Every structure is written in C-alpha cells, then in structure tokens.
C-alpha cells in the first residue's frame, strides 16, 4: 500500500478487474487521500458497471484506456458514473497499444505508474521494454485455482538475469516469500 501512495497511477488489465474486483486504493492509516489514479487497460470496455472501481470513481479517479472497438453506449454509461474513458490506438490483435497508452497518461501528468496486475499486463510491459523498475514479490505458488505465474509464462529470471536490469539492495525474506527490487540500467 505504501507503493500505491508513492505513484501517480496504478495500472491493471481488465482481466484483473474481472477476476478480483479490486479497490486499488491506499488503505494505510491516514493515507487514504494518497490513493493514485486507478487505470484499467480495457480494449472493449468489458469492465462491469457494478465493479468496485466504477462504483468508487467519484471518490478516487478511474481512467479506462480503451480502443475504438469499445461500445459507445458502455462508454457513456461509464462516463455517467464518473469514469474517464480515454481512447488509445489498438495493436494488430485489438489490444490497447501500450506506448500510446503511456503517452496519453503522460499528457495528463502521469509519469510514475505502478503496474500492479495482472500477469498478462506485466508480461506485455516487460516484452515491450517499458519497465524502468521492477519490484518482484515471489510466493511459493499461484494465487487461486486459476492463478497465473507472475508474468503469464515469462519467467521472473527474465528480469533477474537481464543485462537491462540490476538489483537494488538485498533480497528480503518475508516468511516463505521473497522481495527484490530491480532498476533499469541506463
């Protein structure tokens, strides 16, 4: 939650919203007002109107990054609930173009984004070389019966062994889990 308080925006893919219905707010005592903009990459606007994110959009901003394939009626319904819907370029396979999405976020003053979930989003950002810092928290298994590995089949060693990243500080042991931070080599 402290990481959330230190960034401009939290980014998740719509699959995370559909699976977990997260709040994506900072829930540390006395820091609720530090909750960043909550950003969802959702090419077809499949986020449920009854999701926690949409329901709380007037309290903590929610921006949905979508494509021209999105249903205009759903766009209007989301906007009526206080959600900012931002159209981005689409990739050849119909997903939100990550470079365009980050450029549109930057146009709105967002420069520090925490990509919190899910596995497909993490993998796409790493493969597109759009990660400046990685905080890896590894647990001894997947979460839930349909759980995915942290980066949807892209091994964590992709970052650990990459010449593009170096570890910052020591690996921390947190019970059976471990946490390590990596930064891009400039």
What are these regions (language model features)?
Residues 1-186:
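Enzymes that bind and transform nitrogen-containing heteroaromatic metabolites
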């Amino acid at each position: 939650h402290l990481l959330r308080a230190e960034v401009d925006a939290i980014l998740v893919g719509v699959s995370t919203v559909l699976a977990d219905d997260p709040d994506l707010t900072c829930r540390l005592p006395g820091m609720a007002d530090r909750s960043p903009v909550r950003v969802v990459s959702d090419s077809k606007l499949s986020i449920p109107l009854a999701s926690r994110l949409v329901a709380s959009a007037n309290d903590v901003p929610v921006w949905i990054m979508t494509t021209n394939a999105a249903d205009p009626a759903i766009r209007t319904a989301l906007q009526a609930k206080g959600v900012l819907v931002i159209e981005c370029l689409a990739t050849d396979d119909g997903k939100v173009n990550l470079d365009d999405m980050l450029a549109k976020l930057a146009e709105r003053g967002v420069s520090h984004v925490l990509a919190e979930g899910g596995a497909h989003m993490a993998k796409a950002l790493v493969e597109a070389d759009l990660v400046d810092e990685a905080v890896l928290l590894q647990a001894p298994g997947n979460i839930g019966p349909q759980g995915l590995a942290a980066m949807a089949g892209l091994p964590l060693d992709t970052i650990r062994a990459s010449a593009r990243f170096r570890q910052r500080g020591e690996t921390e042991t947190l019970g059976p889990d471990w946490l390590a931070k990596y930064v891009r080599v400039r």
